[in-house]
Amino acid sequence: MSHAIIASIYEAKLIAWSKARTEPIKVVFENVKYEPADGETYLRAFMLPGETASSTLAGDHRAFIGVYQVSIVAPANSGKTKTNPLVVELTALFRLYARDTKSGFTVVTMSPVEQGPGITDAATYMVPLSFQYRADTGS
């Protein structure tokens, strides 16, 4: 259940950031179909939950560990002029060791935002960004 809380924290953070931009950008989350307008750049966000661990003999501790990925999707053949500024903005948004809390549940960004290689297909150019997270509950 707590991976779901973590997803909701990061989704809310992305939505608030997008709305605050001079030019808001569409953010599409998991299991949502989206047909972009011609020439539109948008984001796709994914939760990649990892292990749920416990480090106490009583079993009252849980560590929720995983990766959060935000992919920038731009039109093919548009170069990096649309993606590079977004990489900078998203890197600043998800700062290393940032603590985000919802209803007493805190998640920490455990790694710097890492940019993966751009992936081109016939219609789009996608730049994946990801970082590791961790949230601890219990003793």
Where are these predicted regions, by residue range?
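Mid-chain, well-packed structural core segment of small domains
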Residues: 73-94
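Small/polar-rich, solvent-exposed N-terminal microdomains that initiate assembly or binding
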Residues: 1-60, 81, 97-103
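Residue-level signal for secondary-structure boundary sites
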Residues: 53, 78, 137-139
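Acidic-leaning, charged glycine-interspersed low-complexity segments
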Residues: 21-24, 91-139
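Oligomerization/assembly interface segments of phage tail-like spikes and tubes
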Residues: 60-77, 125-136
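Short capping loops/turns at secondary-structure boundaries
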Residues: 3, 83, 120-124
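Short, surface-exposed linear patches
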Residues: 50-52, 65-69, 90-96
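Sterically constrained small-residue positions within well-ordered secondary structures
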Residues: 36, 61, 118-122
